[in-house]
Regions:
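S-adenosyl-L-methionine
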Residues: 1-52, 156, 160
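The AdoMet/dcAdoMet-binding core of the Class I SAM-like
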Residues: 39-139, 159, 191, 201-202, ...
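SAM/dcSAM-binding transferase cores
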Residues: 1, 96, 119-120, 206-261
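Conserved Class I S-adenosyl-L-methionine
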Residues: 185-211
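Conserved beta-strand signature within the Rossmann-like core of class I S-adenosyl-L-methionine
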Residues: 142-144, 171-179
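A short glycine-rich, Lys/Arg-flanked "PGG" loop and its adjoining helix->strand segment in the class I
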Residues: 155-172
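A short SAM/SAH-binding and catalytic strip from SAM-dependent methyltransferases
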Residues: 141-156
Length: 261
């Protein structure tokens, strides 16, 4: 389906959400994920660079990674995660309409058939199933976090989930997300991530970049943001079985200590 920019994207009937709405698949993938993760710069100093693509969908983020790094002199591992390859299979069969997938159609088709494909210096792997249950992939240097929204897929945004994810990060790592939600940012911070503002995309004037180390952030959240958290009526972290509401005194104290550390 066409989005506001005129680009063609896919829409999930099951989840009721459009992939990369407003600006289209490649503009969002390049700017939000590949650019903010500084993959080209980091691939020059880390080998192999390990990238987790969480929410493969129709592979726009994966294509943006290959576009940027396939000719890189150093090795890269791209690990894509999703419940199903159905969106990518559909995209391969409709590559001409989507446009961005045409140069990568053969690679995508091989991934669908075999679960792995090499594209230049990029080794691309697919991991099916529930990402929350654990994955057999090496710890990443960058996570392109693109599941369905907290409203449609709440289990992928909980504090407990992000705590488990953070515990697996043994290398300096960034996580990029389209969300600008105060509750999501609070959740990431309480899970252990340092959290910062990301660049605009589409109708959003900010996105989110989280990291294991504060020096990986360009614009870390600060005391002014904490003031907004304090005043918000929906800043409580997204816990399993929890409800939206203001942040508790205990959570705010922990958040303040982490942000101001």
């Amino acid at each position: 389906m066409p989005v506001a920019s005129g680009a063609i994207s896919l829409r999930s009937v099951l989840y009721g959400e459009t992939f990369h709405p407003v600006v289209g698949p490649m503009a969002e993938a390049r700017g939000l994920h590949v650019g903010q993760s500084r993959l080209v710069e980091r691939a020059a100093i880390v080998e192999p660079l390990i990238v987790w693509d969480v929410g493969l969908g129709a592979a726009a983020n994966a294509v943006a990674v290959m576009e940027a790094l396939a000719a890189n002199p150093s090795r890269v591992e791209l690990h894509s995660f999703d419940h199903s390859l159905a969106p990518l299979d559909f995209a391969v069969r409709n590559a001409e309409a989507l446009g961005y997938l045409v140069p990568w159609r053969e690679a995508a088709a091989t991934l669908v058939d075999q679960g792995r494909v090499d594209v230049g210096k990029v080794a691309w792997f697919f991991h099916p199933g529930d990402f929350r249950s654990g994955v057999a992939a090496p710890p990443p240097h960058a996570i392109l976090y693109d599941p369905y929204s907290p409203a449609a897929n709440p289990g992928m945004w909980t504090l407990e989930h992000f705590q488990r994810l953070f515990s697996r990060l043994t290398e300096p790592c960034t996580l990029t997300s389209y969300s600008r939600s105060t509750a999501v940012r609070v959740t990431l911070a309480l899970a252990g991530f340092h959290v910062g503002r990301g660049t605009a995309t589409g109708e959003k004037n900010e996105t989110t970049v989280a990291a294991t180390h504060r020096d990986l952030l360009v614009d870390p959240l600060d005391g002014d943001w904490l003031g907004r958290v304090r005043r918000s009526t929906k800043a409580a972290p997204l816990r399993e079985g929890g409800v939206a509401g203001p942040i508790s005194e205990d959570d705010f104290a922990a958040l303040s200590a982490h942000v101001c550390d």
